[in-house]
């Protein structure tokens, strides 16, 4: 926990960081039971503490697809969201201004993924306007926040490729 506060130098920043951390922890407690594997839980922790500044928010929030209305937040993480015939490890629903886009986040553990099947799935989702980002389970387990920050940077870059 103390590593999250390394950049904090003045009292107000420490307090703000503490609030951000508390919100991320509450969201993790809400989202963790929805995850189906340890690497998904690891990545969830990273996604909840990643740098989402491009989307003008400090925290992502969890959406439980089973029993909640969709929150009106800039970055929403929906674990196990069903899209047509697929269930995504995570759907990132991103809002900036009046524009909303969805990105599938897949945690590729060596036992459960087949490249050919994954490519078909990615093409299907792409036809629906949903991009896919994949991370290898070993990397997620080793550096979950690093993977999550790569995802945050990747979706910011991806977002810029669309006409506004």
Feature-to-residue mapping (PLM):
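A sequence-composition feature that detects small, non-aromatic residues
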Residues: 8, 24-26, 45, 50, ...
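Basic, amphipathic alpha-helical patches used to engage nucleic acids or provide basic targeting signals
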Residues: 86-157, 161
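A general structural-boundary detector
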Residues: 30, 34, 77-78, 112, ...
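Short, mixed-charge, low-aromatic patches
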Residues: 2-3, 73-78, 103-110
């Amino acid at each position: 926990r103390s590593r999250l506060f390394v950049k904090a130098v003045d009292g107000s920043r420490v307090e703000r960081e503490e609030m951000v951390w508390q919100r991320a922890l509450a969201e993790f407690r809400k989202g963790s039971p929805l995850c189906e594997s340890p690497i998904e839980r690891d990545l969830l922790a990273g996604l909840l503490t990643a740098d989402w500044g491009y989307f003008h928010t400090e925290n992502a929030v969890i959406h439980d697809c089973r029993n909640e209305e969709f929150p009106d937040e800039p970055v929403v993480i929906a674990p196990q969201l069903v899209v047509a015939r697929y269930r995504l490890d995570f759907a990132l629903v991103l809002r900036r201004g009046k524009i909303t886009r969805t990105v599938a986040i897949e945690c590729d553990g060596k036992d459960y993924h087949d490249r050919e099947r994954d490519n078909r799935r990615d093409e299907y989702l792409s036809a629906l306007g949903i991009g896919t980002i994949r991370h290898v389970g070993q990397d997620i387990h080793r550096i979950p926040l690093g993977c999550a920050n790569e995802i945050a940077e990747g979706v910011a870059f991806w977002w810029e490729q669309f006409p506004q």
